[in-house]
From Swiss-Prot:
Its main location: membrane. GO terms for cellular component: plasma membrane; proton-transporting ATP synthase complex. It comes from the Bacteria. NCBIfam families: atpD. F-type ATPases have 2 components, CF(1) - the catalytic core - and CF(0) - the membrane proton channel. CF(1) has five subunits: alpha(3), beta(3), gamma(1), delta(1), epsilon(1). CF(0) has three main subunits: a(1), b(2) and c(9-12). The alpha and beta chains form an alternating ring which encloses part of the gamma chain. CF(1) is attached to CF(0) by a central stalk formed by the gamma and epsilon chains, while a peripheral stalk is formed by the delta and b chains. It comes from Corynebacterium aurimucosum (strain ATCC 700975 / DSM 44827 / CIP 107346 / CN-1). The gene is atpD. HAMAP family: ATP_synth_beta_bact (MF_01347). It is a peripheral membrane protein. This is ATP synthase subunit beta. It catalyses: ATP + H2O + 4 H(+)(in) = ADP + phosphate + 5 H(+)(out).
């Protein structure tokens, strides 16, 4: 279905205007009567600073009346002066799409950073697109097996769904995203798109080099809007990455994984732009259009007939406050939430997933099966009972518990440790090989632990391992030492 927005993407008119006002990254431009550019159109202006000429891209954000538009700059406006000539490109910001983007790093405007000029001669799509029509959506629900025990068992991911990684600073969100990129490339030979929203330059460089070293870069496109760039760039980079992913889904009929790190910085950039445009702030200082902006992004991330975009989004939680409007608005769109807990990380258990607060809408017998559901509920029940007993243990000690409660606590400790796992991307730090555990093995292992088959094994035998074979090997090593 052809929409007005898509028709606008292909327009090729070029209208000249002039700069009348510059306030930081916000630029007011006057156009001749009848030549007003459409909202979201890209404008270009030549800027000379210290004898160096460059082209700055602006995006139309508001129509002010009297042939004036207010635009947001996608680059620093140093050197931009009143009266400078501005050209309307007649279309939104466009990015290269297709196989050409794999293995390369782009900015929000679609410029290749590691190989300048790459992709500009090929097909390009505008970053503002309509979501798929209702009759094109896929109705079937399917599990995305990750090989990570705690996720597959307790918070299974939906193929074509949206998954949020929640947590404060330093609990492992980016590491888990890197691990998922590696697993998708290795196990499914799938295409991944990574959108770094407000990324630190160091983090982006490290990610690029690590992926190159691990041999998964050729199946991944990376798009960065770095922390030091204007808010307009950080607000649009997620849409640029999503547009590349949509091409793989809609044209090449591929299942794609879209990683967004960090969706909070997308909200934060929107808040900055909203303030610069003079909008009245809403709750906690966020933009009044927060829910709308989030919806525009999230509604495009979905499954269509036979192909999908599965999105994994890191969500920074300010001051670990889950009632903050930014994470709270994100919650509404997610199919699964994986909460990374500082308390679990402090025990040295990674991934530091909190199994009691993480959720998945597909953890239902009709979708995952009766046995999977029952084992998951037994594991959650044991961990919940252990949590309830912690106050008694802290005050009176383990000796005051009944025999049944003592067994529950001991099993919970084994389960908690066994939910940890070695990651492929962490091999160089831990010195231990990463592990992929099939879902069937995970269900079997936790069922046996819940049944008490390993009650005589010491807790150390379950530390951050893969499957039960690793537990047996660790137990054998421990008994030999004795």
């Amino acid at each position: 279905m052809t929409t007005a927005l898509q028709e606008q993407n292909t327009q090729s008119s070029a209208t000249a205007g002039r700069v009348v006002r510059v306030i930081g990254p916000v630029v007011d431009v006057e156009f001749p009567r009848g030549g007003l550019p459409a909202l979201y159109n890209a404008l270009t202006v030549e800027v000379t600073l210290e004898a160096v000429a460059k082209t700055v891209t602006l995006e139309v954000a508001q129509h002010l009346g009297d042939n004036l538009v207010r635009a947001v700059s996608m680059a620093p406006t140093d050197g931009l002066v009143r009266g400078a000539a501005v050209t309307d490109t007649g279309k939104p910001i466009s990015v290269p799409v297709g196989d050409v983007v794999k293995g390369h790093v782009f900015n929000a405007l679609g410029d290749c950073l590691d190989q300048p000029g790459l992709g500009r001669d090929g097909e390009q799509w505008g970053i503002h697109r309509e979501p798929p029509a209702f009759d094109q959506l896929e109705g079937k629900t399917e599990i995305l097996e990750t090989g990570i025990k705690v996720i597959d068992l307790l918070t299974p991911y939906v193929k074509g769904g949206k998954i949020g990684l929640f947590g404060g600073a330093g609990v492992g969100k980016t590491v888990l995203i890197q691990e998922m990129i590696t697993r998708i490339a290795r196990e499914f030979s799938g295409t991944s798109v990574f959108a770094g929203v407000g990324e630190r330059t160091r983090e982006g460089t490290d990610l690029f080099l690590e992926m190159e070293e691990m041999g998964v870069l050729q199946d991944t496109a990376l798009v960065f809007g770095q922390m030091d760039e204007p808010p307009g760039v950080r607000m649009r980079v997620a849409l640029s990455g999503l547009t590349m992913a949509e091409y793989f889904r809609d044209v090449q009929n591929q299942d794609v994984l879209l990683f967004i790190d960090n969706i909070f910085r997308f909200t934060q950039a929107g808040s900055e732009v909203s303030t610069l445009l003079g909008r009245m702030p809403s709750a906690v200082g966020y933009q009044p259009t927060l829910a709308d902006e989030m919806g525009v992004l999230q509604e495009r991330i979905t499954s269509t007939k036979g192909k999908s975009i599965t999105s994994l989004q890191a969500v920074y939680v300010p001051a670990d406050d889950y009632t903050d409007p930014a994470p709270a608005t994100t919650f509404a769109h997610l199919d699964a939430t994986t909460e990374l807990d500082r308390g679990i990380a402090s025990k040295g258990i990674y991934p530091a997933v909190n199994p009691l607060t993480s959720t998945s809408r597909i953890l239902e017998p009709s979708i995952v099966g009766e046995r999977h559901y029952e084992v998951a509920q037994r594991v959650i029940g044991i961990l919940q009972k252990n949590k309830e007993l912690q106050d008694i243990i802290a005050i009176l000690g383990m000796d005051e518990l009944s025999e049944e409660d003592k067994i529950t606590v001991q099993r919970a400790r084994r389960i908690e440790r066994f939910l940890g796992q070695n990651f492929f991307v962490a091999e160089k730090f831990t010195g231990l090989p990463g592990s992929y555990v099939p879902l069937a093995d995970t269900i079997d292992a936790f069922e046996r632990i819940c049944n008490g088959e390993f009650d005589h094994y010491p807790e150390q035998a379950f530390n951050g391992l893969g499957g039960l074979d690793d537990v047996e090997a660790a137990y054998k090593k421990l008994t030999e030492k004795k």
